[in-house]
Structures are given as C-alpha cells and as structure tokens.
C-alpha cells in the first residue's frame, strides 16, 4: 500500500514538474517575442517612398471589403487598377464589370487557388497591393508583397500572433517598403476633428481614453459558404479575447501619440461568459446544423485595460454578440475636458462656448466650424458623395495616394499596425493567466522616444 501511494505521488510529482516545464517554456517563448529583436534594417518611421506620378494598384481579395476599395479607387485621380485576385469567380466578375463601367481599362485577373495571388505579386507593373482577405492571410500576404518590391496596404488586423507582428515589422525594415494597416476610422470626421482639438490643447494634458468595437454581428453566422461570416464566425470558437481592437483603438492611439512620444506598456484583460452565439444558433438554426455543433469560447464582452509608458490609461472593449446599439466609444479625457462619441458630446472647463462642464454639449456644429480637420475641409464633401462608412474610407484612400504621389510619409506605419493588432493576442494571454498584466512588445525598438508626433496634415 505504501509503495502504491509512493508511486502515485511520484507520478503526480512528475506530472506537476512537466506542467511547470511546459508553462516555463511557454512563458519564455512569450518573453522572447516581447523583447526587441535585432533590427532587420533601418527604421521605417517617417519612411518616404519615391514620388509616383501614377500609383499602379493590385488588389488581393475583392469580395465584401475588397470590392468597396475597388469602388473607391475608381473615384481617385492618379491611379491605375492593374490587377485583381480572388478565389471566387463571381466577385472577380463583379469587380471587373465595375471597373470597366467606370471607363477604366480592364484589369488582369488571377484566380484558381489560394496561392494565385503570387502570380499578381510577380508582376513588375504594380506599386502597391491592397489586401482584403480573411484575417489569417493578412500577415503572410503583406510580407510577400513587400518582399516582391511593393508597398503593402492590409486590412485590419495586420497580424494574429506576436511573432507575425515582428515578421511584418522586420520585413518592412529590411525591404524599406511601407506596410500600412488600413484603419479607416482614423479618417472619420469626428475622429479627425478630435485629433485637431487634442493638438490645439482643447482638452489639456491627456489622461485616459476609451475605445471599442461594439457591433452586433450575430447575423453573419448565417453566411455559411461565402462572405465574412463564413470564416469570421470560427474565430469565436478559437480565441477568447478582444478579436477586433483596432477600430476604436486607432484614433485614441493617435490622440495620445502612441509610438510618437508614448507607447503601450502593459495590458490586462477580462471576458464575460460566452453565451450569446450558442443561444443565437439554437434559435436560428436546426438542432443538427453545423452552427449548433460549434463550441463558442470567446466571451460575449471583452474589456481590456492598457497602461502607457507615460501613465495614461485606455479601456478597450469588444462585443459583436449582444443586442445593443453600435459604438466605438471614442472617448478622450484630459485635464481640461472630455470628448465622447456615440452620441458625440463635449464638456470642457475652459475654452468652450459658455456651457458648464457639468453638462454635455451635444451641439456639434459650432465645434465643427472651429475645429474641423483640414483634410475634411478639403475633401469632406467629395467623401460624403463617394461614401464608404460615412466617407472615412474615401478620405483614407485619398490620403494614401496623396502621400505616395507627393513624396510624404504615410499617417500610419507598420509599428502602428503591429501595436494596435497585438492587443488581440495579448488580451488572450492575459485571460489565460487570470487576467494578470502582459507586456507589450516595443516594435519600434526604442525609436518611439524620438519619433515626431503625428501632425495636423493638410492636403
């Protein structure tokens, strides 16, 4: 009996030791991914590409989001739409038809398999590539785009692991090519106005921000074979964290000059139970349907808190499951006042229009009149006509092409894309460790300390 107990004890002790070793290996792997790696090339902060009289564009992915970009590019001057790629013939045909109807030359078409995009990348008459594919393809395609000598413009998120983030950063530095994650919300009218107000000191010294992606998308679960829900639904069965942080976080980061005088230091994260998607599947699908066989593990509501090196705080939330109105929060609080979105409202102690800071001022027109961003003043009406999330898509693409044609640095660089995207992964790490804090990698390798703040750009 004694020997049996001893054997069981030794077996348990061995299992515990193995568990500790496994945990230490995982911890060491995470620590090594956080530590700055040897620089692969020169920093691309402020990278300016040689001027392009005409920007020649290739598109990888022209389905839901990609087709929207095709539509917007047809309204831009100084661009040629050279080639498009997708695995679905129907969306390719739609994109080609639209381009031709806009009196533009018919683009080359690439399809056939998941790697057909490499044929597009092999062309020598393309300057930039717009990547609008499922998330898992973003980093690999961006890396191959830069390695082919082209600038990469990739949809959100830029990458799905810490290692992928580093690989994209390293490739940009080694090739000296732009990799911009196309965070369109940074170009919304309100976001640009608030950026202008922040730079003019309206809110005083910044203290705290709140960002979110609150967008009920359960209906996408009914997209089974094609469209976004056909692949996005499965991420709710693979991860528990903030799956989609950048729409709210991008603008708040620019307000705070993240990677340009401050940077994210550490994060802690919590998730609610994951209930809503299983309930929706039970209500909307037959019992034997695939959607009812999935195990949904991503908490319906995730809340993460970020601390910056300068001590500022940012709350970031994700909720695409519960029935509630859309919101990105878009709150920025300073020593002199606050702006909050959804609905837009302002309260300031000094420098306002006479209203007490104990009450919200929701009359935005006078604030627009005084602080509208120069970009929106220049092309806002054109953006509203051409559409794209209220015009922000058009402003983003217009600004991208303007910078490339005029030899200016882009407003968002690879370090921004990595820093905003990595919240996805770090929130998961924190949740798996009882919401203990996790450290952000410094993708700039210290260059954030001397990088110039993002200015109020004109046009």
Curated annotation (Swiss-Prot):
Enzyme class: hydrolase
Cofactor binding note: Binds 1 NAD(+) per subunit. The NAD(+) cannot dissociate.
GO molecular-function terms, A-Z: hydrolase activity, acting on glycosyl bonds; nucleotide binding
Post-translational modification: Predicted to be exported by the Tat system. The position of the signal peptide cleavage has not been experimentally proven.
Binding site for substrate: 213, 232, 244-247, 326
Pfam families: GFO_IDH_MocA, Glyco_hydro_109_C, TAT_signal
Keyword set, alphabetical order: Glycosidase, Hydrolase, NAD, Signal
EC number(s) stated in the UniProt entry for this protein: 3.2.1.-
Cofactor(s) the record lists: NAD(+)
Signal sequence residues: 1-31
InterPro entries found in the cross-reference section: Gfo/Idh/MocA-like_OxRdtase_N, Gfo/Idh/MocA_oxidrdct_glycsds, Glyco_hydro_109_C, NAD(P)-bd_dom_sf, TAT_signal, TAT_signal_bac_arc
Binding site for NAD(+): 64-65, 86, 135-138, 155-156, 184, 244
Role of this protein: Glycosidase.
Family: Belongs to the Gfo/Idh/MocA family. Glycosyl hydrolase 109 subfamily.
Protein name in the entry: Glycosyl hydrolase family 109 protein
Species in which this protein is naturally found: Shewanella baltica (strain OS155 / ATCC BAA-1091)
Source taxonomy: Bacteria, Pseudomonadati, Pseudomonadota, Gammaproteobacteria, Alteromonadales
């Amino acid at each position: 009996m004694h020997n049996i107990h001893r054997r069981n004890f030794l077996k348990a002790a061995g299992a515990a030791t193995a568990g500790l070793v496994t945990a230490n290996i995982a911890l060491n792997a995470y620590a090594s991914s956080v530590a700055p790696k040897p620089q692969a090339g020169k920093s691309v902060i402020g990278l300016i590409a040689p001027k392009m009289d005409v920007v020649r564009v290739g598109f990888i992915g022209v389905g839901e989001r990609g087709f929207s970009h095709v539509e917007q590019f047809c309204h831009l001057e100084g661009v040629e739409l050279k080639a498009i790629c997708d695995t679905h013939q129907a969306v390719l045909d739609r994109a080609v038809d639209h381009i031709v109807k806009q009196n533009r030359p018919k683009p080359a078409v690439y399809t056939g398999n998941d790697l057909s995009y490499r044929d597009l990348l092999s062309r020598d008459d393309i300057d930039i590539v717009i990547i609008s594919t499922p998330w898992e393809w973003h980093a690999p395609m961006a890396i191959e785009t830069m390695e082919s000598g082209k600038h990469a413009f990739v949809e959100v998120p830029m990458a799905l692991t810490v290692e992928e983030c580093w690989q994209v950063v390293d490739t940009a530095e080694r090739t000296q090519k732009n990799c911009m994650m196309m965070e369109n919300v940074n170009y919304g009218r309100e976001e640009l106005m608030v950026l202008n107000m922040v730079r003019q000191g309206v809110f005083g010294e910044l203290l705290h921000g709140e960002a979110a992606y609150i967008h009920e998308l359960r209906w996408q679960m009914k997209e089974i074979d094609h469209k976004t829900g056909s692949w996005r639904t499965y991420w709710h069965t693979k991860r528990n964290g903030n799956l989609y942080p950048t729409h709210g976080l991008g603008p708040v980061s620019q307000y705070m000059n993240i990677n340009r005088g401050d940077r994210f230091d550490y994060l802690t994260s919590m998730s609610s139970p994951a209930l809503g998607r299983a309930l929706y599947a039970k209500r909307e699908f037959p019992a034997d349907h695939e959607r009812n066989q999935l195990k949904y593990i991503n908490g319906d509501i995730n809340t993460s808190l970020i601390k910056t090196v300068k001590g500022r705080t940012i709350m970031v939330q994700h909720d695409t499951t519960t029935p509630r109105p859309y919101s990105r929060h878009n709150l920025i609080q300073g020593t002199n006042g606050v702006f909050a979105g959804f609905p837009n409202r302002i309260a300031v102690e000094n420098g306002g229009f006479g209203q007490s800071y104990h009450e919200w001022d929701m009359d935005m027109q006078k604030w627009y009149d005084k602080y509208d961003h120069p970009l929106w003043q220049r092309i806002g009406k054109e953006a509203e006509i051409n559409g794209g999330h209220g015009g922000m898509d058009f402003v983003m693409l217009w600004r991208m092409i303007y910078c490339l044609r005029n030899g200016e640095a882009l407003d968002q660089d690879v370090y921004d894309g990595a820093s905003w995207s990595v919240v996805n992964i770090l929130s998961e790490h924190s949740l798996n460790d009882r919401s203990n804090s996790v450290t952000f990698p410094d993708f700039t390798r210290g260059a954030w300390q001397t990088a110039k703040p993002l200015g109020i750009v004109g046009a």
